[in-house]
């Protein structure tokens, strides 16, 4: 391939990220890709970036040589730039307004385990950021009977497998990956069976361990990006645009920012504008650092050396004054002069302010370590219809706890703090203990949300049970003839529960609606019990101005005297909590009550209970 000169560049290299569930092989795949590149021994073309690895087109073509008869292609992109750190937390920082800096993604799925929680979360964030992806169906070497052919293209290795092994591969591809993509609304198929890649997600079986299928993975990635993303990959000579991946200390030079440049040119001395915790940061590039060219992979510590300029797409470390204020996930723009810097600063300020949430409404408090993770948290919460009162970048501080207390006043279930990958300051911890505010912390978004949702459900259920316990349930009893043990003060009688339930503390009324007292105690065969249900015969004591023979008689039927508000709740919020016989008794109670008050337990203008 002709050497890519700066002036003659037509397309820049696509930026590729690797996502997937923990232990599905993301890091192994990246290591394999880097190792393959070094092993290809292309002098001068093996370039490492800060936080990224570049695989030149010539290496891809060399690897894919055996495939040319099956998949003919010619590369016009310079190669592929892989972001070194896998996972969707870092991917979240590759943000740009309306999408992502990443041009393409590899979703790594263990073909034997299939989709796991982080697989779904990865797809969710790819959808949110509108990033196209292919699936690397990893660990084919773990399929029973698979005979490994190291560093061989998948299609060639497949021909060397037994028929039953091929069939097992097909079954696992379908059951664990392709069918799951269909369930999520994606058409998908094995890459070599696809005619229209714009409509179908390509699934490439690989082994990151043995290197099988890596040739196809790189060839498909390169082919798809240059064919469908040319408009996005056009090289621009103008001022650079990028995004901060990470802020770090550079020994001897102070604070530095690891940045992915996705457009234009960045030069030493340029004015750059980025986003900080307390507003936009305008500064000058003091130094640009890139790793020295590698002779072999896995060098313990890569040395960085200064360079004068960097062209997109690239990973570079920028040293500049004031970067200690900058935050990961913030955009980076090069300004031509101070006037343009002020305009860009306003643009950055608006972009970051749009992410921060500050309201007086009910909702959870969100703190995250970077703008990217904050954005991902907000999107994930909104998708789950969880309201947000306050969201910002930085550690959990005392003021966040005060916000949570204010939110709890409006809704007790939302007075909590969700802290993603950030510290909780000691004074915040103290304040939280003082006010009983729960702080959820985790460095995996889906686990953080899972923990909160579990807690939320438990709290709502506990509150519901508490409310339920306060309600008088429908109950109907008959005084058993011959079982009057005491006529008054309190009256003690034997009763049969005809329907519903009775409990101590429940008021009782006659069939004419007149209240006659309250159940004080219930006994069954001499033992005190807390409730009696339909079909039971028990002894009850009744407190109040009631005398057997004057106010009630043997054989009388009594009902629990349900307050109107309780009846409304039984007919609406807690209807599903009533048994069939309780519902029958409730209708009878409502009928009795309506003779005295026709509006009793009328809900939304419609009488409830006469014929519910």
Curated annotation (Swiss-Prot):
<dbReference type="InterPro" id="IPR036925">
    <property type="entry name" value="TIF_IF2_dom3_sf"/>
</dbReference>
<feature type="region of interest" description="G3">
    <location>
        <begin position="84"/>
        <end position="87"/>
    </location>
</feature>
<keyword id="KW-0342">GTP-binding</keyword>
<comment type="similarity">
    <text>Belongs to the TRAFAC class translation factor GTPase superfamily. Classic translation factor GTPase family. IF-2 subfamily.</text>
</comment>
<feature type="region of interest" description="G2">
    <location>
        <begin position="45"/>
        <end position="49"/>
    </location>
</feature>
<dbReference type="InterPro" id="IPR029459">
    <property type="entry name" value="EFTU-type"/>
</dbReference>
<dbReference type="InterPro" id="IPR027417">
    <property type="entry name" value="P-loop_NTPase"/>
</dbReference>
<dbReference type="GO" id="GO:0005525">
    <property type="term" value="F:GTP binding"/>
</dbReference>
<dbReference type="Pfam" id="PF11987">
    <property type="entry name" value="IF-2"/>
</dbReference>
<comment type="function">
    <text>Function in general translation initiation by promoting the binding of the formylmethionine-tRNA to ribosomes. Seems to function along with eIF-2.</text>
</comment>
<dbReference type="InterPro" id="IPR023115">
    <property type="entry name" value="TIF_IF2_dom3"/>
</dbReference>
<dbReference type="InterPro" id="IPR005225">
    <property type="entry name" value="Small_GTP-bd"/>
</dbReference>
<dbReference type="InterPro" id="IPR009000">
    <property type="entry name" value="Transl_B-barrel_sf"/>
</dbReference>
<dbReference type="GO" id="GO:0003924">
    <property type="term" value="F:GTPase activity"/>
</dbReference>
<feature type="binding site">
    <location>
        <begin position="138"/>
        <end position="141"/>
    </location>
    <ligand>
        <name>GTP</name>
    </ligand>
</feature>
<feature type="region of interest" description="G5">
    <location>
        <begin position="207"/>
        <end position="209"/>
    </location>
</feature>
<dbReference type="GO" id="GO:0005737">
    <property type="term" value="C:cytoplasm"/>
</dbReference>
<feature type="region of interest" description="G4">
    <location>
        <begin position="138"/>
        <end position="141"/>
    </location>
</feature>
<dbReference type="InterPro" id="IPR000795">
    <property type="entry name" value="T_Tr_GTP-bd_dom"/>
</dbReference>
<feature type="region of interest" description="G1">
    <location>
        <begin position="20"/>
        <end position="27"/>
    </location>
</feature>
<keyword id="KW-0547">Nucleotide-binding</keyword>
<dbReference type="InterPro" id="IPR004544">
    <property type="entry name" value="TF_aIF-2_arc"/>
</dbReference>
<feature type="binding site">
    <location>
        <begin position="20"/>
        <end position="27"/>
    </location>
    <ligand>
        <name>GTP</name>
    </ligand>
</feature>
<dbReference type="GO" id="GO:0003743">
    <property type="term" value="F:translation initiation factor activity"/>
</dbReference>
<dbReference type="InterPro" id="IPR015760">
    <property type="entry name" value="TIF_IF2"/>
</dbReference>
<dbReference type="Pfam" id="PF00009">
    <property type="entry name" value="GTP_EFTU"/>
</dbReference>
<keyword id="KW-0396">Initiation factor</keyword>
<dbReference type="Pfam" id="PF14578">
    <property type="entry name" value="GTP_EFTU_D4"/>
</dbReference>
<keyword id="KW-0648">Protein biosynthesis</keyword>
<feature type="binding site">
    <location>
        <begin position="84"/>
        <end position="88"/>
    </location>
    <ligand>
        <name>GTP</name>
    </ligand>
</feature>
<feature type="domain" description="tr-type G">
    <location>
        <begin position="11"/>
        <end position="229"/>
    </location>
</feature>
<protein>
    <recommendedName>
        <fullName>Probable translation initiation factor IF-2</fullName>
    </recommendedName>
</protein>
């Amino acid at each position: 391939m002709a050497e890519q000169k700066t002036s003659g560049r037509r397309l820049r290299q696509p930026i590729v990220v690797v996502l997937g569930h923990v232990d599905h092989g993301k890091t192994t795949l990246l290591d394999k890709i880097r190792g393959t590149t070094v092993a290809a021994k292309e002098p001068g073309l093996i370039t490492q970036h800060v936080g990224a690895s570049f695989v030149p087109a010539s290496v891809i073509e060399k690897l894919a040589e055996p495939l040319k008869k099956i998949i003919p292609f010619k590369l016009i992109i310079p190669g592929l730039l892989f972001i070194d750190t896998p996972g969707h937390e870092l991917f979240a920082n590759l943000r740009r307004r309306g999408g992502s800096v990443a041009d393409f993604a590899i979703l790594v799925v263990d073909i034997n385990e299939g989709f796991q929680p982080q697989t779904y979360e990865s797809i969710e964030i790819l959808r949110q950021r509108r990033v196209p992806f292919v699936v690397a169906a990893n660990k084919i070497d773990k399929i029973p009977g698979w005979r490994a052919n190291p560093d061989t293209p998948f299609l060639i290795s497949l021909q060397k497998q037994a028929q039953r092994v091929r069939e097992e591969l097909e079954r696992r591809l379908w059951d664990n990956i392709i069918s799951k993509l269909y369930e999520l609304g994606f058409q998908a198929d094995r890459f070599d069976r696809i005619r229209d890649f714009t409509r179908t997600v390509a699934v490439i079986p690989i082994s990151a361990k043995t290197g099988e299928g890596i040739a196809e993975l790189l060839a498909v990635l390169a082919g798809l990006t240059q064919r469908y993303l040319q408009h996005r990959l056009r090289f621009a000579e103008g001022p650079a645009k990028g995004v901060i991946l990470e802020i770090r200390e550079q020994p001897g030079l102070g604070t530095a920012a690891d940045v992915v440049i996705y457009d234009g040119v960045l030069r030493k001395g340029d004015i750059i504008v980025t986003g900080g915790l307390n507003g936009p940061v305008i500064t000058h590039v003091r130094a640009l650092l890139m790793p020295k060219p590698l002779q072999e992979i896995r060098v313990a510590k890569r040395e960085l050396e200064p360079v004068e300029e960097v062209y997109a797409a690239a990973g570079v470390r920028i040293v500049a004054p004031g970067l200690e204020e900058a935050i990961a996930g913030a955009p980076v723009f090069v300004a031509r002069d101070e006037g343009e810097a002020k305009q860009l600063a306003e643009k950055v300020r608006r972009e970051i302010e749009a992410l921060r949430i500050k309201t007086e409404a009910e909702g959870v408090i969100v703190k995250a370590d970077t703008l990217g993770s904050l954005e991902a948290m907000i999107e994930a919460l909104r998708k789950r219809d969880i309201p947000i009162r306050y969201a910002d970048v930085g550690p959990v501080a005392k003021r966040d706890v005060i916000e949570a207390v204010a939110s709890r006043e409006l809704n007790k279930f939302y007075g909590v703090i969700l802290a993603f990958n950030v510290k909780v300051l000691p004074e915040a911890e103290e304040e939280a203990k003082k006010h009983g505010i729960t702080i959820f912390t985790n460095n995996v978004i889906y686990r953080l949300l899972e923990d909160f949702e579990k807690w939320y459900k438990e709290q709502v259920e506990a509150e519901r049970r508490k409310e339920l316990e306060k309600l008088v349930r429908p109950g109907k009893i008959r005084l058993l003839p011959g079982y009057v043990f005491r006529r008054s003060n309190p009256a003690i009688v034997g009763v049969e529960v005809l329907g519903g339930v009775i409990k101590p503390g429940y008021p009782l009324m006659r069939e004419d609606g007149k209240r006659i007292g309250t159940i004080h105690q219930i006994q069954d065969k001499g033992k005190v019990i807390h409730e009696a249900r339909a079909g039971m015969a028990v002894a009850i004591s009744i407190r109040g101005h009631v005398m057997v023979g004057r106010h009630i008689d043997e054989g009388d039927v009594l009902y629990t005297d349900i307050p109107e508000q309780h009846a409304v709740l039984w007919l609406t919020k807690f209807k599903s909590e009533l048994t069939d016989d309780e519902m029958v008794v409730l209708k009878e109670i409502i009928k009795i009550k309506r003779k005295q008050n026709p509006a009793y337990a009328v809900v939304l203008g419609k009488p409830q209970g006469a014929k519910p």
